[in-house]
Amino acid sequence: KETIMKMKNIIKKQQKTIFIGFMSVALFIICICTVCTAYAADKDNAKTPVDIPGLTYDHSMELSYAEEFSVDYYNDGYALITIDQEGQFLVVPEGKKAPKGLEKDITVIQQPLNNIYLVATSAMDLFRAIDGIDSIRLSGTQENGWYIQEAKDAMESGKMIYAGKYNAPDYELILDEGCGLAIESTMIHHNPEVEEKLEQFGIPVMVERS
């Protein structure tokens, strides 16, 4: 009996050793896979700056949390904004021109911008934070729909006027006001014909994804 008990104890110890060994190997493999995945993700995130004819890349905006966009800065004050799934926008400084040979899928935004058509309501607070509400002339929300006091005040004073909601903009008013940029929310994707119409009129459309 003692011999049998000893044999059972030896078998149990061996099984325990095998189990621990198996788990150690499994954990090691998981760690290796995790490191490889993280490395691959880092490589994917390290995007190569776009080569723009006539411009020299300088640096990129450092982002701590945002993942939906990136900003690359070039010489002479040019900046390329990339918004995931929405496209790229080249911001051209006042007095400068868009470089020749620019890719057709890059939208040009010419500074200064003083007559923005803001449809994405969530972006208004960002404009307030940078003291930029004065650059918004056209609103996609009526005065009583704004929760931001500065926007209400601007509409009450006439500095900002209602130009129709995202799916029914007042094209004539927007054109008369010399709109240089329309900032839309993702709701515009339900009415792609509106975005196409604005672009046909030469108005850049940027879809905000915050």
Regions found by a protein language model. Give the residues of each.
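A short, structured surface patch at a secondary-structure boundary
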Residues: 77-83, 87-175, 181-188
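N-terminal hydrophobic or amphipathic helices and topogenic motifs
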Residues: 6, 19, 33-112
